[in-house]
Amino acid sequence: MFLKVHEIAFLFGLLGNIVSFGVFLSPVPTFYGIYKKKSSKGFQSIPYICALASATLLLYYGIMKTHAYLIISINTFGCFIEISYLFLYILYAPREAKISTLKLIVICNIGGLGLLILLVNLLVPKQHRVSTVGWVCAAYSLAVFASPLSVMRKVIKTKSVEYMPFLLSLSLTLNAVMWFFYGLLIKDKFIAMPNILGFLFGVAQMILYMMYQGSTKTDLPTENQLANKTDVNEVPIVAVELPDVGSDNVEGSVRPMK
């Protein structure tokens, strides 16, 4: 006996909840390491700020939308876990990172959501409110999927997958597949569309992981190292041409003064 469309949609939504639960929990080892070392270890808070914004918006969207229990359930948990991650990050991050993270939380998560709710209720006709919030949710979902771009850039530069766990990349890919089919089957473009990009980014991250797994890590130059480079004004007879940061030529060159 074949399942009906709404039953298949429920199945994908349920699987999406299960995989999303894993996605939300996948950074736990990272934050446990932060807790043990009492340091943020160079990790960035932006992906978690975007994830919290997306979860709160999708929760608001689910509340406005009829019978969106699967969306409400997972995003309620998502809000709780992302707030927990950000609390740990702020607790152990350097002072500048703490301040910038708190500013972003106030602007994006508190101010942004509050302003959206206010504008939607004041300016948008009731029959268009769900679609308006849906478009905003889709835009935020794209921001969440695009946020690992900075991490991918760091992986390419350092040739290290330290900051990009494979489990997280795999979970994001599976998560995007489940929610795409859920959105497709219930004819919700605001759920389906962003997950196409989510799938592509997830696959790209897994490819990077396979390329650089086991590679020797290349440390990026620190500010002190850059400041201590030889000054050409200190060399009276020859001019020293220093290599650009990130160049394969680490020796530089020496040429006579003209």
From Swiss-Prot:
GO biological process, one term: nectar secretion
InterPro entries (UniProt xref): SWEET, SWEET_rpt
Distribution of this protein across tissues and organs: Specifically expressed in nectaries, mostly in the lower half of nectary parenchyma.
Membrane topology category: Multi-pass membrane protein
Extracellular-facing ranges: 1-7, 64-69, 125-131, 187-189
Highest rank taxon of the organism: Eukaryota
Consequences of knocking out this gene: In sweet9-1, reduced nectar production accompanied by starch accumulation in nectaries.
One GO cellular component term noted in the UniProt record for this chain: trans-Golgi network membrane
Cytoplasmic side: 29-42, 91-103, 153-165, 211-258
Cell compartments where the protein resides: Cell membrane; Cytoplasmic vesicle membrane; Golgi apparatus, trans-Golgi network membrane
Domain MtN3/slv: start-end pairs: 10-96, 132-216
Entry keywords, A to Z: Cell membrane, Cytoplasmic vesicle, Golgi apparatus, Membrane, Repeat, Sugar transport, Transmembrane, Transmembrane helix, Transport
GO molecular function: sucrose transmembrane transporter activity; sugar transmembrane transporter activity
Subunit structure: Forms heterooligomers with SWEET1, SWEET5, SWEET8, SWEET11, SWEET13, SWEET16 and SWEET17.
Family that this chain belongs to: Belongs to the SWEET sugar transporter family.
Entry function: Mediates both low-affinity uptake and efflux of sugar across the plasma membrane. Nectary-specific sugar transporter required for nectar production by mediating the secretion of sucrose from the nectary parenchyma to the extracellular space.
Protein name: Bidirectional sugar transporter SWEET9
Upper lineage: Eukaryota, Viridiplantae, Streptophyta, Embryophyta, Tracheophyta
